[in-house]
């Protein structure tokens, strides 16, 4: 499997801080049992980054975070 890099993800979410927040929130969702949007056997963090790099998850993820 190809490696996922931050540069791949930055094409979808150009702000590094928003990228980190979106990836963290999505990884927590996956760890809690949410269905992944891609087929993968990787850890939740890697799956979250792959979803972001492929454009399936974006900055809109931050609007779902409970305050």
Swiss-Prot record:
Endpoints of the signal sequence: none
Gene3D superfamilies the UniProt entry points to: 3.90.940.10
EC number(s) recorded for this UniProt protein: 2.7.7.6
Keyword Zinc-finger: no
InterPro entries documented for this protein: DNA-dir_RNA_pol_omega, Pol_omega/Rpo6/RPB6, RPB6/omega-like_sf
Enzymatic reactions: RNA(n) + a ribonucleoside 5'-triphosphate = RNA(n+1) + diphosphate
Name of the protein: DNA-directed RNA polymerase subunit omega
Species of provenance: Burkholderia ambifaria (strain ATCC BAA-244 / DSM 16087 / CCUG 44356 / LMG 19182 / AMMD) (Burkholderia cepacia (strain AMMD))
GN (gene name): rpoZ
